[in-house]
Swiss-Prot record:
Protein task: Inhibitor of cathepsin D (aspartic protease) and trypsin (serine protease). May protect the plant by inhibiting proteases of invading organisms.
GO MF entries: aspartic-type endopeptidase inhibitor activity; serine-type endopeptidase inhibitor activity
Family according to the record: Belongs to the protease inhibitor I3 (leguminous Kunitz-type inhibitor) family.
UniProt-listed Pfam families: Kunitz_legume
Residues bearing attached sugar chains per UniProt: 19
Protein name per UniProt: Aspartic protease inhibitor 11
Disulphide bonds in the chain: 48-93, 142-159, 150-153
Amino acid sequence: ESPLPKPVLDTNGKELNPNSSYRIISIGRGALGGDVYLGKSPNSDAPCPDGVFRYNSDVGPSGTPVRFIPLSGGIFEDQLLNIQFNIATVKLCVSYTIWKVGNLNAYFRTMLLETGGTIGQADSSYFKIVKLSNFGYNLLYCPITPPFLCPFCRDDNFCAKVGVVIQNGKRRLALVNENPLDVLFQEV
């Protein structure tokens, strides 16, 4: 029988709550640090900020709060969920708070994380939170409906790690082969 699912914990050791907001903070300090935030994508014609970035250091501003939306129940390791920046916004921009993985970017040869997604739909972008062996978590992107256009989806569950590429001097979240982003979740 499968082991009981393990709840994902925040920086205070509390179980993540779907009704609460969290900052995604990186484990690294200094230049290796930096919270995740919602920002404007270069060259985007979207009417709202539509890029998922992280600040260049942990002394930078605080990140944009997110909420994690599981398909049902609580927030557990290795479970499909949607991610949404939990901020007040005008009606036009509501969908531009919901994370999704963009189309293949020819320059970066990977897919960048952006917003403009949907929640709980077949075509939504689903993520998983997986525990690192010692401390902290990684985010994975796990497409659930074909066609699986996902160059780095390699593991048993057909998921790809979320890491960072440098786009116009900013750190943009993207699917990566190596060096995934090691993160913690800090309740807001």
